[in-house]
């Protein structure tokens, strides 16, 4: 799912007119993995503008909460979606639309639900508020073939332990 590197730029775009400039800056910096959040009225316009660009991004969409969001992603040929939580209904619906769903997890129960529904990637969210790498270690002991995508509160000062984690 991740291309080139383990860094994903998480974007909440308020002004779609600025989205291409932002995208070009990220691309020129070597960041090609994007999670564009469906949180603003301009989110969809930004997604469409970036998709139409000649930039070879690996685009995922975040804050996917319902079937309507999945239908939109399918229409845009988006291959993966992020959610802040683990929701059985949307996990099942994502299979119907052939979209790789990456649910938010914070407990071993979340992991169990996600694995039971065929998820290969899990979003550890809100990473730093949950206890960071220490907490991740405690809930991921049974994870062998799954990959974790840590999000929330990670910055240039605390990123190294995440990049070095065996499941990330």
Description of each model-found segment:
Residues 1-79, 86, 96, 145, ...:
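Conserved N-terminal beta1-alpha1 strand-loop-helix module at the mouth
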Residues 42, 65-68, 74-161:
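Conserved anion-binding
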């Amino acid at each position: 799912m991740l291309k080139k590197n383990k860094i994903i730029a998480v974007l909440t775009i308020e002004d779609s007119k600025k989205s291409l400039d932002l995208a070009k800056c990220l691309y020129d910096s070597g960041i090609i993995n994007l999670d564009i959040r469906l949180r603003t009225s301009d989110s969809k316009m930004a997604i469409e503008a970036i998709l139409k660009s000649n930039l070879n991004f690996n685009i995922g969409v975040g804050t996917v909460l319902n079937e309507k969001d999945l239908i939109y992603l399918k229409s845009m040929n988006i291959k993966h979606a992020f959610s802040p939580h683990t929701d059985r209904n949307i996990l099942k619906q994502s299979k119907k639309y052939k979209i790789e769903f990456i649910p938010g997890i914070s407990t071993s129960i979340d992991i169990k639900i996600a694995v039971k529904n065929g998820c290969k990637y899990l979003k550890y969210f809100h990473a730093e508020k949950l206890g960071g790498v220490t907490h991740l270690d405690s809930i991921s002991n049974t994870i062998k073939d799954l990959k974790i995508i840590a999000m929330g509160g990670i910055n240039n000062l605390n990123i190294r332990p995440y990049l070095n984690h065996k499941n990330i």
